[in-house]
């Protein structure tokens, strides 16, 4: 059965960018599986870091995210 959904232009463009030769259904299915997998990983590692360690990791991840976004923007401007 086919269903129609409404998504914003920016979401459509992002899906279009990552889909390659896959169908939108395949891409969405992969993203949903990935999300579920991440949830399972989080359940397994919950509680292994102290609050201080968690805050440090969180800070570093935010820094890395910013660096990655800058790198990604530099690639799209080429």
From Swiss-Prot:
It holds the Pfam family VAPB_antitox. Keywords: Toxin-antitoxin system. It comes from the Archaea. Disulfide bonds: none annotated. Possibly the antitoxin component of a type II toxin-antitoxin (TA) system. Belongs to the UPF0330 family. This is Putative antitoxin PF1222. The lineage of its organism: Archaea, Methanobacteriati, Methanobacteriota, Thermococci, Thermococcales.
